[in-house]
Amino acid sequence: MTLTAKKSCAHPWTTNVARCALRRASTILIAVLTAGFAQNAIAAALPQTTSKSRAEAVLDSMPKAKTIQQAEISPDGKLVAWISEGKIHLELVEVLRGATGKEISVPGGLEARELAWSPDSQKVAFIADENSAIPASQLWIADVKGLDSHKLANLRGYVSTPSFSPDAKMIAVLLIENMPRKAGPLVPMTPPSGLMEEKIYEQRIATIDVVSGELKQVSPPDMYVYEYDWAPDGKSWAVSAAKGSGDNNWWIARLYTVDAISGTMREILKPKLQVAVPRFSPDGQSIAYISGIMSDQGSTGGDIFVVPVSGGEARNLTPGMKASATWLKWTGPNQILFTENIDGNSGIATVSGASGQVRQVWNGFEMLSADGWGIQISLASDGNSSAVVRQSISSPPEVWAGPIGAWRKLTSLNSTVKAAWGEARNVHWTNDGTGIQGWLLFPKDYDTSKKFPLIVVVHGGPSAACMPRWSTADGAASAMGWFVLCANPRGSYGQGEAFTLRNVKDFGGGDFRDIMAGIDAMAKEYPVDLDRLGIHGHSYGGYMTMWAETQTNRFKAAVAGAGLSDWLSYYGENDIDEWMVPFFGASVYDDPKVYARSSPINFVKNVKTPTLILVGDRDGEVPAPQSFEWWHALKTVGVPVEFVVYLDEGHTISKPQNRHDYDLRTLAWFEKWFAAGEDEHKTSTAFSSRN
């Protein structure tokens, strides 16, 4: 599994990384385990000499760009609000006049997140998080004319997704009351104790009166609501929801309507696959949504469907589309505008709700976002004026606004930040007649007369993709003098739903061969040193790293972050086993063979590749025992191995000191083994070990 948050921040080229919050920590708390010993966490992190290694010097020299969490255009298209670096202010910029930005301060030094405009474009609501051990937030409203702001409500628990009602009298939010941690399977899990599942925290829709601040929980207490959208008349919501554990049951969520007064739920649809982004049509008679095989909430990709609110059969508007829809909004009675991953690029298109005709509006060699997460834009009521956060491998994030495709840059937050790495190309190759796409980052000082090592980066997911986003981690690898290939093998987004479905019941099969074919294709085209290959990934990428080691000895070194070594034991260890059934076709108890044949642990005696293993000790998505199993197995078979456990970290390694340590150890591991003598680690051709 991935990743972002809403899926994973595990690797910066994946679609699911930018939402990850960086939290302050006074010390680096890590445990380092090597092939023969364990040592004190703090001592392990301290440098042994006063001089920096080359890897450390290169990583520390990388440009520091400011991040942008969200950009939202007002419904009238005249103003844009955004949040940068989770700071305690919001900036408003007039799109048409280009006026200087204004700030809305939050008293008490609180961090602001998740903006929402009022329908009349006169107010902005946002969430401010209190500095407390367990989630506690405040809901604020600011008047954009006078910039006066006031606190509307105190909220105990995890709150997200504020949205004004069509008449602006209410603000709806998603609230998990008294939740002891942030929501989602990516954050550090609460250590287990006592009776399991004695308390299940459900995420409910709550409304807050904009005058009195009165809070009312509306949706049923036994349902976990993942997403919602106001009906045009304000009387109901379209929601995706499921009973039971919210972390686990997103993969079996159904489509409902919820009465905004009584909370009565009515089922509209039981989808065949996962469902995301439900949106009412302008007349309130239909609901559009995205459905496809998805491995993580928030990492959205699939086709666009429409279903009557009254129920009935859903229509696929985009069957056979060679792209993955990621977000949508109705722009007319029979027109839907959507964003997409199209061949690894960001795209914007429209589809007719009547005929299903798709029209490409824009696409580019860059990453577009509006919420700091996936491919998405913020769209005004006219269906054309928009705000976006634009970034690419060579350009750091900035806020842009204007007509789609004719945006004007509004911010200069990173105007002095320049890429310190080589160029990047959108590359293609074939395997077994299947076209595969990826991104190739060149060494900084590229010279066609020389050969350079190559690192393969495998994204999380598997339903995700490498995207052309700003990444200092990959930039550092380029600055070290290495190629970086981030492949999008079968199972990824960007080539259509049929392509994403192609690794179902085939983990480690066609996807692995696609990656290896990519290495050979790059070596034919560019001066790749095939005696110095590396592989690295986190989550599903960590699994693929472990799997690759059992299938070939071509790699000189490997780094497996939050990897899965044994699918059978993993099924009983993780908090999200529902995700596995769509991908493996059955539970592990009904078809253990399909899990066993894709488990690296069953072929561990083939491994010769020196391996670095990294994991958070409170990872609920890919629990640390999976990494312990791999570490123990590699020690037993005599493979050089180091194992790092980050304390109080979840699936995402998010604390700044730990994130730096993660990236530094990764670079240093490849540097060490790329420099090793050929007699220490011979490369060889691939061998077959799978039944």
Predicted regions and their residues:
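Beta-strand-rich domains and repeat architectures in extracellular enzymes and scaffolds
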Residues: 60-88
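Non-catalytic accessory segments flanking enzyme active sites
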Residues: 69, 172-174, 181-183, 198-205, ...
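Residue-level detector of Asp-centered blade-edge/turn motifs that repeat once per structural unit
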Residues: 75-76, 119-120, 166-167, 232-233, ...
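Hydrophobic beta-strand positions that form the internal "hydrophobic ladder"
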Residues: 77-80, 124, 168-171, 237-238, ...
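A flexible loop/linker signature enriched in serine peptidases of the S9 family
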Residues: 84-90, 106-112, 125-140, 154-160, ...
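Short loop/turn segments that connect beta-strands within beta-propeller blades
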Residues: 94-98, 143-147, 209-213, 259-263, ...
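Cap/lid segment of the alpha/beta-hydrolase catalytic domain
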Residues: 405, 411-531, 536-539, 569-582
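Active-site-proximal cap/loop segments of hydrolase catalytic domains
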Residues: 486-691
